[in-house]
């Protein structure tokens, strides 16, 4: 898989910061991840020139000098003293907020600054990945973002409805294997938790506080009724509500899964072997897995395709089959 541009630039910055001397272009091509993908010396040279210009545009002090007194070849390095940031320490909430903001900002005038800031933070060893921190970020107003680039098409509509205090109506399903049902909700805010978006609000149909994953909401979200009809109750902690909903705890249930011989190593490690078994003429074994999150387990098993087959429970098997059919349909 080809290395992304941002990852390649981060690798280059780290390499040029880690040396007191100068590194030749040839050494960079052979040792810095992302450049070995170049099909030719000419292609590498063009890519490297673009990357050098980009680093300079970002304000990174790239220096050029002779590799040694006996070697006239030019090399490159980054002046540590000029580049060094004062110590940057972000709390989990702050780190997650930075990462979420970069997902939301898409305007041309912001994207360069966003990528530049991320590049400097990551190269300085600052973790800004919400999937790693696991920290949730709550957004209760469309004013919190200037542009939307998320995969959830309904996010902008929900944020506008939250701003105006309008009730929303949409179709929703609890899992891929279940049918959609129409829900009428007083929206309070949206929260990102472990890379997913959730709507928190009062479900009028259930007369209770509910959490809805945005990826399970249908494409049509309709604001209904007058503006100002809903308010967020005082003292409501959106992040706490979502965290309690999605936190993985033992359910007491077990899944029985067949895995092909030599495949699905991570799944094998997580489970307990129940003995060898052939399935469809293939050698393998049956493993037992504790179900902490049915959704997460279904996603993981789906990723192994025909190398992992759910035997029990039926609900998990149906969920995995629905995901596989959806993937096959998308590729058709």
From Swiss-Prot:
Pfam families: WYL (PF13280). Transmembrane segments: none annotated. It comes from the Bacteria. Interacts with PafC; with which it probably forms a heterocomplex. Belongs to the PafB family. Part of the pafABC operon, however PafB does not seem to be involved in pupylation or substrate degradation. Appears to play at least a small role in resistance to reactive nitrogen intermediates (RNI) in vitro. This is Protein PafB.
